[in-house]
Amino acid sequence: LGVLEVLETEGIRPTFLAGTSIGGLVGALWASAIPAAEIIAIARGFRFPRRFVPGRVLSWEQIFPTAVPRLEHWAFEDLGTPLVVSAVDLLAGEEVMLHTGPLLPAIRATCAVPGVLPPEPLGGRRLVDGGVMNVLPVDLAWSWEPEIVIAVNIIASPRQTVRLDSRYARIATALGR
Protein backbone atom coordinates (compact mmCIF):
# COMPACT_ATOMS: atom_id res chain seq x y z
CA LEU A 1 0.00 0.00 0.00
CA GLY A 2 2.98 2.26 0.52
CA VAL A 3 3.70 2.03 -3.20
CA LEU A 4 0.30 3.62 -3.93
CA GLU A 5 1.10 6.49 -1.57
CA VAL A 6 4.44 7.12 -3.29
CA LEU A 7 2.87 7.01 -6.75
CA GLU A 8 0.19 9.48 -5.65
CA THR A 9 2.74 11.78 -4.02
CA GLU A 10 4.82 11.78 -7.21
CA GLY A 11 1.75 12.38 -9.37
CA ILE A 12 2.12 9.05 -11.17
CA ARG A 13 -1.17 7.48 -12.21
CA PRO A 14 -0.98 4.14 -14.05
CA THR A 15 -2.98 3.82 -17.25
CA PHE A 16 -3.70 0.15 -16.52
CA LEU A 17 -3.76 -2.09 -13.42
CA ALA A 18 -3.40 -5.87 -13.07
CA GLY A 19 -3.54 -7.89 -9.90
CA THR A 20 -4.18 -11.19 -8.27
CA SER A 21 -5.47 -12.06 -4.82
CA ILE A 22 -5.22 -9.11 -2.42
CA GLY A 23 -3.42 -7.20 -5.19
CA GLY A 24 -6.55 -7.53 -7.31
CA LEU A 25 -8.65 -6.13 -4.47
CA VAL A 26 -6.28 -3.21 -3.88
CA GLY A 27 -6.13 -2.60 -7.63
CA ALA A 28 -9.93 -2.52 -7.82
CA LEU A 29 -10.14 0.00 -5.00
CA TRP A 30 -7.50 2.22 -6.60
CA ALA A 31 -9.00 1.87 -10.10
CA SER A 32 -12.29 3.11 -8.66
CA ALA A 33 -10.48 6.37 -7.73
CA ILE A 34 -10.23 5.74 -3.99
CA PRO A 35 -7.12 7.56 -2.65
CA ALA A 36 -4.28 5.50 -1.17
CA ALA A 37 -4.87 6.85 2.35
CA GLU A 38 -8.48 5.69 2.19
CA ILE A 39 -7.45 2.27 0.83
CA ILE A 40 -5.13 1.92 3.81
CA ALA A 41 -8.05 2.74 6.13
CA ILE A 42 -10.19 0.15 4.33
CA ALA A 43 -7.39 -2.44 4.68
CA ARG A 44 -7.25 -1.81 8.42
CA GLY A 45 -10.85 -2.99 8.51
CA PHE A 46 -9.95 -6.42 7.13
CA ARG A 47 -10.65 -9.05 9.78
CA PHE A 48 -9.20 -12.52 9.93
CA PRO A 49 -10.64 -14.52 12.85
CA ARG A 50 -8.23 -15.03 15.74
CA ARG A 51 -9.27 -18.65 15.93
CA PHE A 52 -9.24 -20.01 12.44
CA VAL A 53 -10.18 -23.67 12.16
CA PRO A 54 -8.47 -25.23 9.12
CA GLY A 55 -11.05 -26.54 6.68
CA ARG A 56 -13.77 -24.20 7.95
CA VAL A 57 -14.50 -21.86 5.08
CA LEU A 58 -15.11 -18.21 5.96
CA SER A 59 -17.26 -15.67 4.18
CA TRP A 60 -16.04 -12.72 2.15
CA GLU A 61 -17.96 -10.35 4.44
CA GLN A 62 -16.22 -11.76 7.54
CA ILE A 63 -12.76 -10.92 6.24
CA PHE A 64 -13.36 -7.87 4.04
CA PRO A 65 -16.34 -6.03 5.61
CA THR A 66 -14.99 -2.59 4.71
CA ALA A 67 -14.33 -3.41 1.04
CA VAL A 68 -17.67 -4.95 0.08
CA PRO A 69 -19.72 -1.72 0.23
CA ARG A 70 -17.08 0.09 -1.84
CA LEU A 71 -17.18 -2.39 -4.73
CA GLU A 72 -20.61 -4.00 -4.83
CA HIS A 73 -22.15 -1.61 -7.38
CA TRP A 74 -19.15 -1.29 -9.71
CA ALA A 75 -18.45 -2.97 -13.04
CA PHE A 76 -15.02 -3.16 -14.69
CA GLU A 77 -16.34 -0.83 -17.39
CA ASP A 78 -17.08 1.88 -14.76
CA LEU A 79 -13.52 2.08 -13.45
CA GLY A 80 -11.45 5.18 -14.10
CA THR A 81 -8.41 2.99 -14.78
CA PRO A 82 -8.71 -0.28 -16.72
CA LEU A 83 -8.17 -3.32 -14.49
CA VAL A 84 -7.66 -7.03 -15.08
CA VAL A 85 -7.48 -9.60 -12.28
CA SER A 86 -6.54 -13.24 -12.47
CA ALA A 87 -8.21 -16.24 -10.91
CA VAL A 88 -7.84 -19.98 -11.38
CA ASP A 89 -10.54 -22.33 -12.67
CA LEU A 90 -10.56 -24.95 -9.93
CA LEU A 91 -11.75 -27.78 -12.17
CA ALA A 92 -9.81 -27.01 -15.37
CA GLY A 93 -6.66 -25.91 -13.54
CA GLU A 94 -6.16 -22.91 -15.78
CA GLU A 95 -5.66 -19.21 -15.22
CA VAL A 96 -8.64 -16.99 -16.08
CA MET A 97 -8.41 -13.26 -16.82
CA LEU A 98 -11.33 -11.18 -15.54
CA HIS A 99 -11.79 -7.67 -16.94
CA THR A 100 -15.46 -7.21 -17.87
CA GLY A 101 -18.77 -7.32 -16.05
CA PRO A 102 -19.58 -6.89 -12.35
CA LEU A 103 -16.48 -6.16 -10.27
CA LEU A 104 -17.29 -7.76 -6.90
CA PRO A 105 -17.65 -11.39 -8.12
CA ALA A 106 -14.31 -11.09 -9.93
CA ILE A 107 -12.63 -9.70 -6.82
CA ARG A 108 -14.16 -12.44 -4.69
CA ALA A 109 -12.75 -14.96 -7.20
CA THR A 110 -9.22 -13.55 -7.23
CA CYS A 111 -9.17 -13.47 -3.40
CA ALA A 112 -10.74 -16.92 -2.83
CA VAL A 113 -7.84 -18.62 -1.05
CA PRO A 114 -8.59 -22.36 -1.14
CA GLY A 115 -9.56 -23.64 2.30
CA VAL A 116 -10.19 -20.12 3.62
CA LEU A 117 -12.80 -18.60 1.29
CA PRO A 118 -15.21 -20.54 -0.94
CA PRO A 119 -14.63 -20.77 -4.70
CA GLU A 120 -16.54 -18.10 -6.61
CA PRO A 121 -19.02 -19.41 -9.21
CA LEU A 122 -18.59 -17.19 -12.26
CA GLY A 123 -19.27 -17.82 -15.93
CA GLY A 124 -19.94 -21.52 -15.39
CA ARG A 125 -16.63 -21.96 -13.58
CA ARG A 126 -15.57 -22.31 -9.95
CA LEU A 127 -12.80 -19.77 -9.50
CA VAL A 128 -10.19 -19.47 -6.75
CA ASP A 129 -7.32 -17.14 -5.86
CA GLY A 130 -5.18 -16.29 -8.88
CA GLY A 131 -2.09 -16.57 -6.70
CA VAL A 132 -2.48 -20.35 -6.82
CA MET A 133 -0.88 -20.19 -10.30
CA ASN A 134 0.50 -16.68 -10.70
CA VAL A 135 1.54 -14.76 -7.58
CA LEU A 136 2.81 -11.72 -9.47
CA PRO A 137 0.96 -11.37 -12.81
CA VAL A 138 3.64 -9.38 -14.64
CA ASP A 139 3.04 -11.44 -17.78
CA LEU A 140 -0.61 -10.45 -17.60
CA ALA A 141 0.33 -6.78 -17.35
CA TRP A 142 2.72 -7.00 -20.32
CA SER A 143 0.03 -8.67 -22.45
CA TRP A 144 -1.80 -5.32 -22.48
CA GLU A 145 1.31 -3.71 -24.04
CA PRO A 146 2.04 -0.90 -21.58
CA GLU A 147 5.19 1.23 -21.83
CA ILE A 148 6.24 0.44 -18.25
CA VAL A 149 5.20 -2.18 -15.68
CA ILE A 150 5.55 -1.56 -11.95
CA ALA A 151 5.26 -4.85 -10.07
CA VAL A 152 4.80 -5.18 -6.31
CA ASN A 153 5.29 -8.53 -4.61
CA ILE A 154 3.75 -8.40 -1.15
CA ILE A 155 4.92 -11.91 -0.28
CA ALA A 156 8.38 -10.98 0.93
CA SER A 157 11.14 -13.44 1.66
CA PRO A 158 12.72 -13.26 5.10
CA ARG A 159 15.81 -11.04 5.21
CA GLN A 160 17.69 -13.49 7.36
CA THR A 161 17.25 -16.97 8.71
CA VAL A 162 17.00 -17.23 12.47
CA ARG A 163 17.93 -20.49 14.12
CA LEU A 164 15.84 -21.27 17.16
CA ASP A 165 17.80 -23.75 19.23
CA SER A 166 15.87 -23.68 22.43
CA ARG A 167 12.27 -24.40 23.17
CA TYR A 168 12.06 -21.05 24.97
CA ALA A 169 13.28 -19.20 21.86
CA ARG A 170 10.63 -20.87 19.70
CA ILE A 171 7.86 -20.01 22.18
CA ALA A 172 9.08 -16.42 22.59
CA THR A 173 9.16 -15.98 18.82
CA ALA A 174 5.65 -17.38 18.46
CA LEU A 175 4.45 -14.90 21.09
CA GLY A 176 6.17 -12.03 19.32
CA ARG A 177 8.69 -11.33 22.09
Language-model features: where?
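Patatin-like phospholipase
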Residues: 1-20, 28-177
